Amino acid sequence: MSWKVVLLLVLLATPTGGLEESYLEESCSTVTRGYLSVLRTGWYTNVFTLEVGDVENLTCTDGPSLIRTELELTKNALEELKTVSADQLAKEARIMSPRKARFVLGAIALGVATAAAVTAGVAIAKTIRLEGEVAAIKGALRKTNEAVSTLGNGVRVLATAVNDLKDFISKKLTPAINKNKCDISDLKMAVSFGQYNRRFLNVVRQFSDNAGITPAISLDLMTDAELVRAVSNMPTSSGQINLMLENRAMVRRKGFGILIGVYGSSVVYMVQLPIFGVIDTPCWKVKAAPLCSGKDGSYACLLREDQGWYCQNAGSTVYYPNEEDCEVRSDHVFCDTAAGINVAKESEECNRNISTTKYPCKVSTGRHPISMVALSPLGALVACYDGVSCSIGSNKVGIIRPLGKGCSYISNQDADTVTIDNPVYQLSKVEGEQHTIKGKPVSSNFDPIEFPEDQFNIALDQVFESVEKSKNLIDQSNKILDSTEKGNAGFVMVIVLIVLLMLAAVGVGIFFVVKKRKAAPKFPMEMNGVNNKGFIP
Protein backbone atom coordinates (compact mmCIF):
# COMPACT_ATOMS: atom_id res chain seq x y z
CA MET A 1 0.00 0.00 0.00
CA SER A 2 1.49 3.32 -1.04
CA TRP A 3 2.03 6.20 1.34
CA LYS A 4 -0.59 8.22 -0.54
CA VAL A 5 -3.27 5.61 0.20
CA VAL A 6 -2.26 5.50 3.87
CA LEU A 7 -2.43 9.29 4.09
CA LEU A 8 -5.87 9.29 2.47
CA LEU A 9 -7.20 6.73 4.96
CA VAL A 10 -5.86 8.76 7.89
CA LEU A 11 -7.49 11.92 6.57
CA LEU A 12 -10.81 10.15 6.07
CA ALA A 13 -10.80 8.75 9.60
CA THR A 14 -9.74 11.98 11.27
CA PRO A 15 -11.84 15.13 11.69
CA THR A 16 -10.49 18.06 9.76
CA GLY A 17 -10.49 20.28 12.85
CA GLY A 18 -12.87 22.58 14.61
CA LEU A 19 -13.73 20.14 17.41
CA GLU A 20 -14.20 21.55 20.89
CA GLU A 21 -14.45 19.38 24.00
CA SER A 22 -15.70 20.65 27.36
CA TYR A 23 -15.06 18.79 30.62
CA LEU A 24 -17.90 19.35 33.10
CA GLU A 25 -16.58 18.96 36.66
CA GLU A 26 -20.11 19.14 38.04
CA SER A 27 -21.16 15.85 36.40
CA CYS A 28 -17.89 14.08 35.41
CA SER A 29 -18.81 14.29 31.73
CA THR A 30 -17.60 15.71 28.43
CA VAL A 31 -19.43 17.40 25.56
CA THR A 32 -17.66 17.38 22.19
CA ARG A 33 -18.96 19.80 19.56
CA GLY A 34 -17.99 20.63 15.99
CA TYR A 35 -19.41 17.63 14.13
CA LEU A 36 -21.75 17.94 11.13
CA SER A 37 -24.72 15.66 10.53
CA VAL A 38 -25.47 13.21 7.73
CA LEU A 39 -28.90 11.83 8.65
CA ARG A 40 -30.71 9.04 6.85
CA THR A 41 -34.24 10.12 5.94
CA GLY A 42 -35.33 7.36 3.56
CA TRP A 43 -34.48 4.33 1.44
CA TYR A 44 -33.83 3.88 -2.26
CA THR A 45 -34.62 0.47 -3.78
CA ASN A 46 -32.58 -1.08 -6.58
CA VAL A 47 -33.81 -4.44 -7.96
CA PHE A 48 -31.25 -6.68 -9.67
CA THR A 49 -31.88 -9.56 -12.06
CA LEU A 50 -28.72 -11.62 -12.24
CA GLU A 51 -29.09 -13.80 -15.33
CA VAL A 52 -27.27 -17.13 -15.15
CA GLY A 53 -28.22 -18.59 -18.50
CA ASP A 54 -29.18 -22.08 -19.59
CA VAL A 55 -26.74 -24.09 -17.48
CA GLU A 56 -29.22 -26.86 -16.72
CA ASN A 57 -28.93 -28.23 -20.25
CA LEU A 58 -25.14 -28.10 -20.33
CA THR A 59 -23.48 -31.38 -19.38
CA CYS A 60 -19.96 -32.72 -19.36
CA THR A 61 -19.54 -36.44 -19.99
CA ASP A 62 -15.96 -36.59 -21.16
CA GLY A 63 -14.24 -36.84 -17.78
CA PRO A 64 -12.89 -34.34 -15.25
CA SER A 65 -12.01 -30.86 -16.42
CA LEU A 66 -11.89 -27.27 -15.23
CA ILE A 67 -15.00 -26.47 -17.26
CA ARG A 68 -16.90 -29.37 -15.70
CA THR A 69 -15.92 -28.31 -12.17
CA GLU A 70 -17.03 -24.71 -12.74
CA LEU A 71 -20.27 -25.86 -14.35
CA GLU A 72 -21.11 -28.07 -11.38
CA LEU A 73 -20.41 -25.17 -9.02
CA THR A 74 -22.87 -23.02 -10.95
CA LYS A 75 -25.63 -25.66 -10.95
CA ASN A 76 -25.18 -26.43 -7.25
CA ALA A 77 -25.19 -22.74 -6.33
CA LEU A 78 -28.44 -22.22 -8.22
CA GLU A 79 -30.08 -25.12 -6.37
CA GLU A 80 -28.74 -23.84 -3.03
CA LEU A 81 -30.21 -20.41 -3.68
CA LYS A 82 -33.62 -21.95 -4.40
CA THR A 83 -33.51 -23.57 -0.96
CA VAL A 84 -32.44 -20.30 0.65
CA SER A 85 -35.30 -18.54 -1.14
CA ALA A 86 -37.84 -21.03 0.24
CA ASP A 87 -36.46 -20.62 3.77
CA GLN A 88 -36.48 -16.85 3.26
CA LEU A 89 -40.24 -16.82 2.69
CA ALA A 90 -40.83 -18.63 5.99
CA LYS A 91 -38.50 -16.29 7.85
CA GLU A 92 -40.09 -13.17 6.41
CA ALA A 93 -43.47 -14.41 7.61
CA ARG A 94 -42.01 -14.40 11.12
CA ILE A 95 -40.45 -10.98 10.65
CA MET A 96 -43.73 -9.43 9.49
CA SER A 97 -45.68 -10.99 12.38
CA PRO A 98 -46.28 -8.45 15.20
CA ARG A 99 -45.76 -11.21 17.75
CA LYS A 100 -42.38 -12.14 16.34
CA ALA A 101 -40.78 -8.71 16.21
CA ARG A 102 -37.73 -10.05 18.00
CA PHE A 103 -36.86 -12.08 14.89
CA VAL A 104 -36.23 -8.85 13.00
CA LEU A 105 -32.98 -8.25 14.83
CA GLY A 106 -31.89 -11.76 14.01
CA ALA A 107 -32.52 -11.10 10.34
CA ILE A 108 -29.35 -9.03 9.99
CA ALA A 109 -26.14 -10.46 11.28
CA LEU A 110 -24.45 -7.19 12.24
CA GLY A 111 -27.48 -5.10 13.08
CA VAL A 112 -26.35 -2.27 10.77
CA ALA A 113 -29.86 -1.52 9.53
CA THR A 114 -32.66 -0.93 12.01
CA ALA A 115 -35.46 -3.40 12.62
CA ALA A 116 -37.94 -0.97 11.09
CA ALA A 117 -35.79 -0.69 7.95
CA VAL A 118 -35.63 -4.47 7.53
CA THR A 119 -39.38 -4.77 8.06
CA ALA A 120 -40.04 -2.09 5.44
CA GLY A 121 -37.62 -3.77 3.04
CA VAL A 122 -39.32 -7.13 3.52
CA ALA A 123 -42.67 -5.50 2.72
CA ILE A 124 -41.28 -4.24 -0.61
CA ALA A 125 -39.77 -7.67 -1.31
CA LYS A 126 -43.16 -9.32 -0.76
CA THR A 127 -44.69 -6.87 -3.24
CA ILE A 128 -42.05 -7.61 -5.86
CA ARG A 129 -42.75 -11.34 -5.50
CA LEU A 130 -46.41 -10.85 -6.41
CA GLU A 131 -47.47 -12.40 -9.70
CA GLY A 132 -46.59 -10.13 -12.58
CA GLU A 133 -44.16 -7.84 -10.70
CA VAL A 134 -41.01 -9.79 -11.58
CA ALA A 135 -42.29 -10.21 -15.14
CA ALA A 136 -42.90 -6.47 -15.37
CA ILE A 137 -39.41 -5.71 -14.09
CA LYS A 138 -37.82 -8.15 -16.53
CA GLY A 139 -39.98 -6.71 -19.29
CA ALA A 140 -38.70 -3.21 -18.54
CA LEU A 141 -35.16 -4.57 -18.86
CA ARG A 142 -35.74 -6.39 -22.12
CA LYS A 143 -34.16 -3.66 -24.25
CA THR A 144 -31.93 -2.00 -21.67
CA ASN A 145 -29.77 -2.96 -18.71
CA GLU A 146 -31.26 -0.31 -16.44
CA ALA A 147 -34.74 1.16 -16.11
CA VAL A 148 -37.07 2.71 -13.55
CA SER A 149 -40.03 0.44 -12.88
CA THR A 150 -43.20 1.24 -10.95
CA LEU A 151 -44.60 -1.54 -8.76
CA GLY A 152 -48.28 -2.24 -8.40
CA ASN A 153 -48.39 -0.36 -5.09
CA GLY A 154 -46.97 2.78 -6.72
CA VAL A 155 -43.42 2.39 -5.38
CA ARG A 156 -40.80 3.29 -7.98
CA VAL A 157 -37.66 1.16 -8.05
CA LEU A 158 -34.52 1.18 -10.14
CA ALA A 159 -34.16 -2.12 -12.02
CA THR A 160 -30.76 -3.36 -13.17
CA ALA A 161 -30.01 -6.40 -15.34
CA VAL A 162 -26.71 -8.24 -14.92
CA ASN A 163 -26.26 -10.25 -18.12
CA ASP A 164 -22.48 -10.81 -18.22
CA LEU A 165 -22.59 -14.46 -17.11
CA LYS A 166 -25.57 -15.31 -19.31
CA ASP A 167 -23.97 -13.72 -22.38
CA PHE A 168 -20.71 -15.59 -21.79
CA ILE A 169 -22.47 -18.94 -21.37
CA SER A 170 -24.76 -18.53 -24.38
CA LYS A 171 -22.31 -16.90 -26.79
CA LYS A 172 -18.97 -18.49 -25.90
CA LEU A 173 -19.18 -21.42 -23.50
CA THR A 174 -22.10 -23.31 -25.04
CA PRO A 175 -20.71 -23.25 -28.62
CA ALA A 176 -17.29 -24.32 -27.33
CA ILE A 177 -18.75 -27.24 -25.35
CA ASN A 178 -20.93 -28.32 -28.30
CA LYS A 179 -17.84 -28.30 -30.50
CA ASN A 180 -15.15 -29.70 -28.24
CA LYS A 181 -17.18 -31.06 -25.33
CA CYS A 182 -15.75 -30.05 -21.91
CA ASP A 183 -12.18 -31.08 -22.55
CA ILE A 184 -11.31 -27.68 -23.91
CA SER A 185 -7.61 -27.26 -24.39
CA ASP A 186 -7.99 -23.49 -24.35
CA LEU A 187 -7.21 -22.63 -20.68
CA LYS A 188 -8.31 -19.07 -21.33
CA MET A 189 -11.92 -20.26 -21.72
CA ALA A 190 -11.89 -21.96 -18.32
CA VAL A 191 -10.38 -18.89 -16.64
CA SER A 192 -12.96 -16.60 -18.28
CA PHE A 193 -15.78 -18.85 -17.07
CA GLY A 194 -14.45 -18.59 -13.52
CA GLN A 195 -14.20 -14.80 -13.73
CA TYR A 196 -17.74 -14.34 -15.06
CA ASN A 197 -19.03 -16.87 -12.55
CA ARG A 198 -17.35 -15.22 -9.53
CA ARG A 199 -20.02 -12.56 -8.96
CA PHE A 200 -22.86 -15.07 -9.12
CA LEU A 201 -21.17 -17.51 -6.74
CA ASN A 202 -20.34 -14.74 -4.24
CA VAL A 203 -23.93 -13.43 -4.32
CA VAL A 204 -25.16 -16.97 -3.60
CA ARG A 205 -22.68 -17.35 -0.74
CA GLN A 206 -23.65 -14.05 0.88
CA PHE A 207 -27.38 -14.73 0.77
CA SER A 208 -26.81 -18.30 1.94
CA ASP A 209 -24.58 -17.26 4.85
CA ASN A 210 -27.02 -14.54 5.96
CA ALA A 211 -30.29 -16.43 5.42
CA GLY A 212 -31.46 -14.17 2.61
CA ILE A 213 -30.78 -10.74 4.16
CA THR A 214 -27.26 -9.35 3.96
CA PRO A 215 -26.01 -6.88 6.62
CA ALA A 216 -24.29 -4.62 4.09
CA ILE A 217 -23.84 -4.12 0.34
CA SER A 218 -20.77 -5.82 -1.09
CA LEU A 219 -19.15 -5.12 -4.44
CA ASP A 220 -20.67 -8.38 -5.70
CA LEU A 221 -24.21 -7.38 -4.82
CA MET A 222 -23.64 -3.99 -6.40
CA THR A 223 -20.57 -2.84 -8.27
CA ASP A 224 -19.16 0.61 -7.69
CA ALA A 225 -20.42 1.81 -11.08
CA GLU A 226 -23.92 0.53 -10.28
CA LEU A 227 -23.81 2.26 -6.89
CA VAL A 228 -22.78 5.57 -8.46
CA ARG A 229 -25.66 5.40 -10.96
CA ALA A 230 -28.16 4.53 -8.22
CA VAL A 231 -27.03 7.36 -5.93
CA SER A 232 -27.11 9.80 -8.84
CA ASN A 233 -30.77 8.88 -9.46
CA MET A 234 -31.85 9.49 -5.86
CA PRO A 235 -34.56 12.12 -5.30
CA THR A 236 -32.42 14.52 -3.27
CA SER A 237 -30.19 17.56 -3.71
CA SER A 238 -26.91 17.59 -5.59
CA GLY A 239 -25.03 18.46 -2.39
CA GLN A 240 -26.43 15.42 -0.62
CA ILE A 241 -25.69 13.22 -3.65
CA ASN A 242 -22.10 14.46 -3.78
CA LEU A 243 -21.63 13.77 -0.07
CA MET A 244 -22.93 10.21 -0.50
CA LEU A 245 -20.69 9.65 -3.51
CA GLU A 246 -17.72 10.82 -1.46
CA ASN A 247 -18.69 8.36 1.29
CA ARG A 248 -19.69 5.32 -0.75
CA ALA A 249 -18.21 2.95 1.83
CA MET A 250 -20.58 4.34 4.46
CA VAL A 251 -23.54 4.03 2.06
CA ARG A 252 -22.65 0.36 1.62
CA ARG A 253 -22.32 -0.21 5.36
CA LYS A 254 -25.70 1.36 6.11
CA GLY A 255 -27.53 -0.49 3.31
CA PHE A 256 -28.62 -4.13 3.03
CA GLY A 257 -29.75 -6.69 0.45
CA ILE A 258 -32.81 -8.96 0.36
CA LEU A 259 -33.21 -12.05 -1.81
CA ILE A 260 -36.40 -11.97 -3.88
CA GLY A 261 -36.13 -15.44 -5.39
CA VAL A 262 -34.93 -17.66 -8.22
CA TYR A 263 -37.04 -17.53 -11.37
CA GLY A 264 -35.81 -20.06 -13.90
CA SER A 265 -32.19 -19.14 -14.49
CA SER A 266 -32.63 -15.62 -13.08
CA VAL A 267 -31.66 -14.62 -9.54
CA VAL A 268 -33.67 -11.59 -8.42
CA TYR A 269 -32.67 -9.59 -5.36
CA MET A 270 -33.07 -6.05 -4.12
CA VAL A 271 -30.66 -3.62 -2.53
CA GLN A 272 -31.84 -0.97 -0.06
CA LEU A 273 -29.65 2.14 -0.18
CA PRO A 274 -29.89 4.83 2.52
CA ILE A 275 -30.89 8.32 1.41
CA PHE A 276 -29.07 10.87 3.56
CA GLY A 277 -31.48 13.78 3.23
CA VAL A 278 -30.24 15.99 6.08
CA ILE A 279 -26.64 17.17 6.08
CA ASP A 280 -24.38 19.68 7.82
CA THR A 281 -26.54 20.45 10.88
CA PRO A 282 -24.67 20.65 14.23
CA CYS A 283 -24.00 17.43 16.15
CA TRP A 284 -22.33 16.81 19.51
CA LYS A 285 -21.39 13.85 21.66
CA VAL A 286 -21.83 13.36 25.43
CA LYS A 287 -19.66 10.95 27.45
CA ALA A 288 -19.67 10.39 31.22
CA ALA A 289 -18.10 8.38 34.04
CA PRO A 290 -19.30 7.63 37.61
CA LEU A 291 -19.04 10.57 40.03
CA CYS A 292 -18.87 9.60 43.72
CA SER A 293 -18.60 11.46 47.04
CA GLY A 294 -17.63 9.57 50.19
CA LYS A 295 -18.20 10.00 53.92
CA ASP A 296 -17.15 7.60 56.70
CA GLY A 297 -16.75 4.72 54.24
CA SER A 298 -20.12 5.29 52.53
CA TYR A 299 -20.61 6.69 49.03
CA ALA A 300 -23.15 8.58 46.96
CA CYS A 301 -22.54 7.90 43.24
CA LEU A 302 -24.14 9.33 40.11
CA LEU A 303 -23.69 8.54 36.41
CA ARG A 304 -25.24 10.51 33.56
CA GLU A 305 -27.50 8.28 31.45
CA ASP A 306 -28.06 10.81 28.65
CA GLN A 307 -24.83 9.82 26.91
CA GLY A 308 -24.75 9.45 23.14
CA TRP A 309 -25.03 11.55 20.00
CA TYR A 310 -27.20 14.64 19.54
CA CYS A 311 -27.98 16.30 16.20
CA GLN A 312 -30.22 19.17 15.20
CA ASN A 313 -32.86 18.32 12.60
CA ALA A 314 -35.64 20.59 11.35
CA GLY A 315 -35.48 22.84 14.41
CA SER A 316 -35.54 19.99 16.93
CA THR A 317 -32.87 18.00 18.73
CA VAL A 318 -32.55 14.28 17.96
CA TYR A 319 -30.88 12.02 20.51
CA TYR A 320 -29.17 8.75 19.55
CA PRO A 321 -28.62 6.78 22.78
CA ASN A 322 -26.57 3.96 21.26
CA GLU A 323 -23.10 4.71 19.95
CA GLU A 324 -23.57 2.25 17.08
CA ASP A 325 -26.49 4.35 15.79
CA CYS A 326 -23.95 6.85 14.44
CA GLU A 327 -20.58 6.55 12.74
CA VAL A 328 -17.96 9.24 12.27
CA ARG A 329 -16.17 9.89 9.01
CA SER A 330 -13.90 12.92 9.09
CA ASP A 331 -16.01 15.62 10.80
CA HIS A 332 -19.33 14.15 9.58
CA VAL A 333 -21.58 11.93 11.69
CA PHE A 334 -23.73 9.39 9.81
CA CYS A 335 -26.88 8.56 11.79
CA ASP A 336 -30.15 6.74 11.15
CA THR A 337 -33.15 8.92 11.94
CA ALA A 338 -35.22 5.82 12.74
CA ALA A 339 -32.96 5.17 15.74
CA GLY A 340 -33.24 8.74 17.07
CA ILE A 341 -35.46 10.19 19.78
CA ASN A 342 -36.68 13.77 19.68
CA VAL A 343 -35.84 15.62 22.89
CA ALA A 344 -36.54 19.15 24.07
CA LYS A 345 -33.95 21.82 23.42
CA GLU A 346 -33.85 22.32 27.20
CA SER A 347 -31.91 19.03 27.38
CA GLU A 348 -28.83 21.18 26.72
CA GLU A 349 -29.19 22.50 30.29
CA CYS A 350 -27.86 19.14 31.50
CA ASN A 351 -24.55 20.25 29.98
CA ARG A 352 -24.57 23.59 31.78
CA ASN A 353 -26.19 23.42 35.22
CA ILE A 354 -27.30 19.87 35.93
CA SER A 355 -27.70 20.56 39.67
CA THR A 356 -30.23 23.37 39.32
CA THR A 357 -32.02 22.80 36.00
CA LYS A 358 -35.69 21.87 36.04
CA TYR A 359 -35.16 19.61 33.01
CA PRO A 360 -35.25 15.91 34.03
CA CYS A 361 -31.63 15.01 33.35
CA LYS A 362 -31.35 11.22 33.42
CA VAL A 363 -28.90 9.57 35.83
CA SER A 364 -28.26 6.29 37.59
CA THR A 365 -27.47 6.15 41.30
CA GLY A 366 -25.56 3.78 43.52
CA ARG A 367 -23.75 3.49 46.83
CA HIS A 368 -20.82 1.49 45.52
CA PRO A 369 -18.12 3.33 43.53
CA ILE A 370 -17.09 1.87 40.17
CA SER A 371 -13.70 2.65 38.64
CA MET A 372 -13.62 2.92 34.85
CA VAL A 373 -12.36 4.84 31.80
CA ALA A 374 -14.71 6.56 29.35
CA LEU A 375 -12.88 7.51 26.16
CA SER A 376 -13.99 10.79 24.60
CA PRO A 377 -13.08 12.10 21.12
CA LEU A 378 -10.31 14.32 22.53
CA GLY A 379 -9.32 12.55 25.75
CA ALA A 380 -10.67 10.37 28.54
CA LEU A 381 -12.69 10.52 31.74
CA VAL A 382 -11.15 8.46 34.55
CA ALA A 383 -13.23 7.40 37.56
CA CYS A 384 -10.71 6.12 40.11
CA TYR A 385 -11.87 5.00 43.55
CA ASP A 386 -10.79 2.83 46.50
CA GLY A 387 -8.93 -0.38 45.81
CA VAL A 388 -7.78 0.65 42.32
CA SER A 389 -4.58 2.28 41.11
CA CYS A 390 -4.80 4.68 38.17
CA SER A 391 -2.15 6.43 36.12
CA ILE A 392 -1.48 8.16 32.82
CA GLY A 393 1.40 7.38 30.54
CA SER A 394 3.33 8.12 27.39
CA ASN A 395 4.11 5.74 24.56
CA LYS A 396 7.74 6.87 24.79
CA VAL A 397 8.53 7.02 28.52
CA GLY A 398 5.84 4.88 30.15
CA ILE A 399 4.00 6.04 33.28
CA ILE A 400 3.96 9.83 33.69
CA ARG A 401 2.16 10.15 37.02
CA PRO A 402 -0.49 8.45 39.17
CA LEU A 403 -4.02 9.81 39.39
CA GLY A 404 -5.80 10.72 42.59
CA LYS A 405 -9.11 9.31 43.72
CA GLY A 406 -12.26 10.70 42.16
CA CYS A 407 -13.10 11.85 38.63
CA SER A 408 -10.33 13.17 36.37
CA TYR A 409 -10.25 14.40 32.78
CA ILE A 410 -7.16 13.53 30.75
CA SER A 411 -6.50 15.45 27.55
CA ASN A 412 -4.97 13.57 24.63
CA GLN A 413 -2.40 16.37 24.53
CA ASP A 414 -1.16 15.47 28.02
CA ALA A 415 -0.95 11.68 27.72
CA ASP A 416 -1.07 8.76 25.31
CA THR A 417 -2.50 6.12 27.63
CA VAL A 418 -4.60 5.68 30.76
CA THR A 419 -4.11 2.66 33.01
CA ILE A 420 -6.51 1.29 35.64
CA ASP A 421 -4.76 -1.57 37.43
CA ASN A 422 -3.76 -3.76 34.45
CA PRO A 423 -5.96 -2.59 31.53
CA VAL A 424 -4.36 0.11 29.36
CA TYR A 425 -6.50 2.49 27.28
CA GLN A 426 -5.05 4.30 24.26
CA LEU A 427 -6.23 7.88 23.75
CA SER A 428 -7.15 9.19 20.31
CA LYS A 429 -4.96 11.74 18.60
CA VAL A 430 -7.78 13.78 17.12
CA GLU A 431 -6.99 17.48 17.35
CA GLY A 432 -9.24 20.12 18.84
CA GLU A 433 -9.73 22.62 21.64
CA GLN A 434 -10.27 21.50 25.22
CA HIS A 435 -11.36 23.38 28.29
CA THR A 436 -12.79 22.73 31.74
CA ILE A 437 -16.05 24.09 33.12
CA LYS A 438 -15.59 24.36 36.88
CA GLY A 439 -18.34 23.32 39.23
CA LYS A 440 -19.12 21.62 42.52
CA PRO A 441 -19.63 17.86 41.98
CA VAL A 442 -23.35 17.19 42.09
CA SER A 443 -22.76 14.05 44.17
CA SER A 444 -21.43 16.21 47.02
CA ASN A 445 -24.97 17.57 47.51
CA PHE A 446 -26.00 14.25 49.05
CA ASP A 447 -25.30 12.58 52.38
CA PRO A 448 -24.19 9.00 51.56
CA ILE A 449 -26.14 7.72 54.57
CA GLU A 450 -29.39 9.11 53.14
CA PHE A 451 -28.57 8.31 49.49
CA PRO A 452 -30.89 5.81 47.73
CA GLU A 453 -29.80 2.36 46.65
CA ASP A 454 -29.19 1.50 42.97
CA GLN A 455 -31.64 3.26 40.65
CA PHE A 456 -31.33 3.28 36.86
CA ASN A 457 -32.23 5.94 34.32
CA ILE A 458 -34.19 8.26 36.59
CA ALA A 459 -34.46 12.03 36.61
CA LEU A 460 -31.97 13.84 38.85
CA ASP A 461 -34.75 15.86 40.48
CA GLN A 462 -36.30 12.53 41.55
CA VAL A 463 -33.04 11.71 43.32
CA PHE A 464 -33.23 15.01 45.19
CA GLU A 465 -36.86 14.26 46.10
CA SER A 466 -35.95 10.75 47.22
CA VAL A 467 -33.16 12.07 49.46
CA GLU A 468 -35.48 14.75 50.84
CA LYS A 469 -38.07 12.09 51.67
CA SER A 470 -35.36 10.05 53.37
CA LYS A 471 -34.41 13.10 55.44
CA ASN A 472 -38.05 13.67 56.42
CA LEU A 473 -38.44 10.03 57.41
CA ILE A 474 -35.28 10.20 59.50
CA ASP A 475 -36.49 13.44 61.15
CA GLN A 476 -39.88 11.89 61.90
CA SER A 477 -38.19 8.80 63.30
CA ASN A 478 -36.01 10.97 65.53
CA LYS A 479 -39.06 12.87 66.77
CA ILE A 480 -40.90 9.66 67.52
CA LEU A 481 -37.81 8.34 69.26
CA ASP A 482 -37.49 11.54 71.29
CA SER A 483 -41.15 11.47 72.29
CA THR A 484 -40.88 7.79 73.15
CA GLU A 485 -37.83 8.45 75.29
CA LYS A 486 -39.63 11.31 77.03
CA GLY A 487 -42.68 9.13 77.59
CA ASN A 488 -40.52 6.36 78.93
CA ALA A 489 -38.79 8.81 81.27
CA GLY A 490 -42.15 10.02 82.64
CA PHE A 491 -43.35 6.48 83.08
CA VAL A 492 -40.20 5.58 84.99
CA MET A 493 -40.59 8.64 87.21
CA VAL A 494 -44.16 7.61 88.10
CA ILE A 495 -43.02 4.09 88.92
CA VAL A 496 -40.18 5.44 91.05
CA LEU A 497 -42.57 7.80 92.84
CA ILE A 498 -45.00 4.97 93.55
CA VAL A 499 -42.18 2.79 94.83
CA LEU A 500 -40.92 5.65 97.01
CA LEU A 501 -44.43 6.21 98.41
CA MET A 502 -44.79 2.53 99.12
CA LEU A 503 -41.39 2.46 100.77
CA ALA A 504 -42.34 5.54 102.78
CA ALA A 505 -45.58 3.91 103.90
CA VAL A 506 -43.76 0.76 104.92
CA GLY A 507 -41.17 2.85 106.75
CA VAL A 508 -43.85 4.77 108.66
CA GLY A 509 -45.51 1.51 109.62
CA ILE A 510 -42.28 0.03 110.87
CA PHE A 511 -41.53 3.22 112.82
CA PHE A 512 -44.78 3.09 114.77
CA VAL A 513 -44.43 -0.62 115.50
CA VAL A 514 -40.94 -0.14 116.87
CA LYS A 515 -42.00 2.87 118.90
CA LYS A 516 -44.92 0.99 120.39
CA ARG A 517 -42.73 -1.88 121.45
CA LYS A 518 -40.28 0.45 123.20
CA ALA A 519 -43.02 2.26 125.23
CA ALA A 520 -43.19 1.33 129.16
CA PRO A 521 -46.00 -1.14 130.21
CA LYS A 522 -48.88 0.22 132.43
CA PHE A 523 -49.43 -2.21 135.41
CA PRO A 524 -52.04 -1.77 138.32
CA MET A 525 -50.93 -0.05 141.60
CA GLU A 526 -48.84 -2.28 143.93
CA MET A 527 -50.88 -3.83 146.85
CA ASN A 528 -49.35 -3.69 150.35
CA GLY A 529 -50.52 -3.43 153.92
CA VAL A 530 -50.33 0.31 154.07
CA ASN A 531 -52.66 1.18 151.37
CA ASN A 532 -54.76 -1.90 151.43
CA LYS A 533 -56.40 -2.62 154.66
CA GLY A 534 -57.49 -5.94 153.52
CA PHE A 535 -54.05 -7.10 152.84
CA ILE A 536 -53.03 -10.01 155.02
CA PRO A 537 -49.32 -10.59 154.92
Swiss-Prot record:
Chain segments annotated as coiled-coil in the UniProt record: 125-153, 459-484
Domain of life: Viruses
Signal peptide limits: 1-18
Keyword Disulfide bond included in the entry's annotation: yes
Keyword set includes Disulfide bond: yes
UniProt keyword list: Cleavage on pair of basic residues, Coiled coil, Disulfide bond, Fusion of virus membrane with host cell membrane, Fusion of virus membrane with host membrane, Glycoprotein, Host cell membrane, Host Golgi apparatus, Host membrane, Lipoprotein, Membrane, Palmitate, Signal, Transmembrane, Transmembrane helix, Viral envelope protein, Viral penetration into host cytoplasm, Virion, Virus entry into host cell
Disulfide bonding pattern of the chain: 28-407, 60-182, 283-311, 292-301, 326-335, 350-361, 384-390
SUPFAM superfamilies: Virus ectodomain (SSF58069)
Cellular compartments per GO CC: host cell Golgi membrane; host cell plasma membrane; membrane; viral envelope; virion membrane
InterPro entries assigned: Fusion_F0_Paramyxovir (IPR000776)
Family to which the UniProt record says this protein belongs: Belongs to the paramyxoviruses fusion glycoprotein family.
Protein name: Fusion glycoprotein F0
Native species: Avian metapneumovirus (isolate Canada goose/Minnesota/15a/2001)
